[in-house]
Amino acid sequence: MQTKIVTVSVTERLSTVEDIMTLGQVRHMPVVHGGKLVGVLSHRDLLRASLSELGSFGTETRRAFLHAIEIAQVMSAPPITIGPEASVQLAARLMADHRIGCLPVVEGEVLAGLVTETDVLCWVAGVKPDPEEL
């Protein structure tokens, strides 16, 4: 589970998220509103929004389009979540059943972490996570 999580506000624009994902090499971003988790935005969601409307547009037009869209329009909501005591097996099953790449870990109403496909694969392979990412 990753505990250093980059979150984004539900009112933020897709252009900002694209920048954060590119610079931070992040593929999943929990979306918050008023301190509460309300959704998850994945790199796949961002690509889907971009490709559906902008297949033949130039970079400037594409950026203008992404800037005009709020995250709430393309995020997955409500998010599928797990608790901090959930097993890796449960996390893997939920990700497979719902065809999602991450699970926010919520303790009460507080976002405590994020379990990704990579975390599950590392567990299966017996690879210890990078301490810098925890």
Q: What are the language-model segments listed below?
A:
Residues 8-25, 31-33, 81-99, 106, ...:
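The conserved cystathionine-beta-synthase
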Residues 36-37, 48:
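Short active-site-proximal "capping" loops at secondary-structure junctions
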Residues 1-4, 42-80, 92-96, 116-134:
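Tandem CBS (Bateman) regulatory domains
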Residues 37-40, 88, 111-114:
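Glycine-rich acetyl-CoA-binding "A-motif" of GNAT/NAT acetyltransferases
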Residues 39, 101-102:
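Glycine-centered small-residue hotspots that permit tight backbone geometry or close packing
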Residues 27, 32, 40-44, 106, ...:
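Short hydrophobic beta-strand motif reused across regulatory alpha/beta modules
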